[in-house]
């Protein structure tokens, strides 16, 4: 019994010492920083449009494996070049961008994103406002734009961007009886947060655990890639593994394999419902509509059987100007096209891919 008490006493002394040193010294050091534990206070929930950005923000945000971007928002919480006031009306024409993380600009400073490129190119004629935020989908598109129009903000032209992941994201949106979003606020317990934010021991254990989990996931992915490409496991390269990851992520791969999300039709139906509402809203307010379809690596590598055909048919029925950017990514060497135009291991465009999208928009839309 004495040994147990003695051991507990030593552990308590160790934890107290860890707590004191961590808060007085360690948490000010570079090694203490861990992106996963960063307080992304600028990304906020909303009962009106589910989630968005805080207004008047200027921060450096980690993204993906190793990228960091400067994220700046204006007075209405839209990503922008600088913190600035947005009036409800403007003497210039106003272009509204509607989309998800690809249009928000994943991983890059604003000048290298679709929004930034359009804003620079069209600055003499248009004020470009970018409403896009990661994990948006048609239900959020409608709710957010409806909110700002009701607030009195005017727009002349809108570009709606839709990709295959939007259909899956839409499936997970929930509404209450009044039509407001039900926000899932579950997450780590406050006690868990307290431990990893105040003790080097627990913070180190978390990082080791995350590292082991990442390695395990990579090895599993490599095994799947070896089977897909009929290669020996040890001959399967990092490039093979990342190519498999880019083309078989389930949020996009459903377009060529409907067994991945058997209820994808529900996502399509829900998306159509809210896109119909959005189109009516824009038309009722005399806002010109351009509807853009663009591929992920999955749709470049394999035939899109369910996503693009569905929306082409929908656009024709509703007399909507649909522009498909799928042809911009066609070619014989699909792997090379994907690696050349997307962030390695990811679904988002790199700078070259973004420039291809930008050039296509400038050529295909009458600004």
Task: List PLM regions with ranges.
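Hydrophobic membrane-insertion alpha-helices, especially the h-region
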Residues: 6-22
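Serine-dependent acyl-ester chemistry module
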Residues: 164-315, 325-333
């Amino acid at each position: 019994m004495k040994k147990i008490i003695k051991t507990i006493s030593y552990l308590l002394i160790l934890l107290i010492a860890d707590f004191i040193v961590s808060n007085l010294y360690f948490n000010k050091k570079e090694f203490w920083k861990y992106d996963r534990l960063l307080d992304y206070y600028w990304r906020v929930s909303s009962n009106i449009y589910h989630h968005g950005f805080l207004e008047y923000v200027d921060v450096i945000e980690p993204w993906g494996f190793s990228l960091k971007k400067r994220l700046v928002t204006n007075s209405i919480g839209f990503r922008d070049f600088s913190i600035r006031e947005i009036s409800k009306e403007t003497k210039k024409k106003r272009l509204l961008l509607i989309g998800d993380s690809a249009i928000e600009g994943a991983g890059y400073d604003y000048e290298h994103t679709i929004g930034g490129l359009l804003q620079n190119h069209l600055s003499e004629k248009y004020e470009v406002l970018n409403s896009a935020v990661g994990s948006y989908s048609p239900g959020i598109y409608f709710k957010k734009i409806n909110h700002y129009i009701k607030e009195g903000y005017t727009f002349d032209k809108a570009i709606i961007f839709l990709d295959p992941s939007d259909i899956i994201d839409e499936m997970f949106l929930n509404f209450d009886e009044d039509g407001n979003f039900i926000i899932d606020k579950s997450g780590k317990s406050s006690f868990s947060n307290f431990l990893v934010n105040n003790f080097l021991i627990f913070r180190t254990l978390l990082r080791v655990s995350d590292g082991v989990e990442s390695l395990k996931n990579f090895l599993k992915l490599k095994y799947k890639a070896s089977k897909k490409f009929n290669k020996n496991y040890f001959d399967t390269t990092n490039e093979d593994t990342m190519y498999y990851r880019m083309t078989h992520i389930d949020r996009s791969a459903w377009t060529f394999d409907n067994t991945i999300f058997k209820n994808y039709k529900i996502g399509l139906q829900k998306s159509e419902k809210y896109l119909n509402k959005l189109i009516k809203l824009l038309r009722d307010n005399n806002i010109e509509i351009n509807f853009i379809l663009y591929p992920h690596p999955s749709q470049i590598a394999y035939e899109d059987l369910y996503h693009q055909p569905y929306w082409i048919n929908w656009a024709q029925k509703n007399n909507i100007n649909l522009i498909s950017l799928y042809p911009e990514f066609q070619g014989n060497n699909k792997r090379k096209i994907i690696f050349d135009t997307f962030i390695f291991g990811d679904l988002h465009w790199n700078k070259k891919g973004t420039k291809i999208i930008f050039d296509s928009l400038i050529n295909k839309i009458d600004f």
